[in-house]
């Protein structure tokens, strides 16, 4: 079965210089993938020809006359640039011409346009960016929100927990994945009012048996793998994500420097070569690139704006896998079962608060 993914090739810090090589590498490694490259056609064709892929049978180009920049306001992105590469790529999902969309562009704009075009699932106020981080148990820790909503109310964090539970249940085959609420301590008395009120909602779900709420977790629990899911607002999540990426690069840099310090340490590096390679791979943030905008009536994936071609390729892979295993339908069913009947009416599409990832 062929899976079609639309790519916003103009998004991110590097645009086609990263998105095109990533698309070529992915489509060559995945025979069931077909990629629709959206952007300024002249630039896309030039990059394709540069990589001798201008006639690839599973790469097609759709022209878009505008580009959403990182500096664009939400109004400009949503109301004025209606033929932007981001908007056109998302429209392809809405029209059924693509199974999923990937963009490294302005996070706020991506969320606003996705909500406007695709709409949210019943009972969901705001989409949340959910992605995975590595942990000591050699498995994934799913974390949300990672930057879509910098300001949240308790009901939003509550919905994030339910959506995260639905996602992990579908992706990992766990009927009752554990949910942790990120806080400054494990004790119930700690945290701000929003976190405390959210904990009350999650405990009520736990008592009803609709959510497996572990309780409050701290930052170090993310990488311990204490819970399957960690819930927080987008401000905290985005800072945590980028701090962890920076730490991974720092550790890799320190290891490289120290093992090159003298002949003896270089010999040690040679002996431990296979282990060091494995460590480097596990700590490489590019391998964890690609977060889903959870809660939409379509699959949209957000790549880090500064991702290189290798990292962007991982974002495409996550979108491909989600479409291949029909994750959207499975999550929709799970959310419908988990969401309370009194769920809030979705907010207007343009009432979005977000940070740029």
Swiss-Prot record:
Q: Name one GO molecular function term.
A: phosphate:acyl-[acyl carrier protein] acyltransferase activity
Q: Which UniProt keywords apply?
A: Cytoplasm, Lipid biosynthesis, Lipid metabolism, Phospholipid biosynthesis, Phospholipid metabolism, Transferase
Which reaction(s) are listed as its catalytic activity?
A: a fatty acyl-[ACP] + phosphate = an acyl phosphate + holo-[ACP]
For this protein, the Enzyme Commission number is 2.3.1.274
What the entry lists under Pfam families is as follows: FA_synthesis
Gene Ontology terms, cellular component aspect?
A: cytoplasm
Q: Where in the cell is it found?
A: Cytoplasm
Main localisation: cytoplasm
- Which pathway does it take part in? Lipid metabolism; phospholipid metabolism
- Entry similarity comment: Belongs to the PlsX family.
| Quaternary organization | Homodimer. Probably interacts with PlsY.
Please give the function described in this protein's UniProt entry.
Catalyzes the reversible formation of acyl-phosphate (acyl-PO(4)) from acyl-[acyl-carrier-protein] (acyl-ACP). This enzyme utilizes acyl-ACP as fatty acyl donor, but not acyl-CoA.
The name of this protein is: Phosphate acyltransferase
* Gene behind this protein: plsX
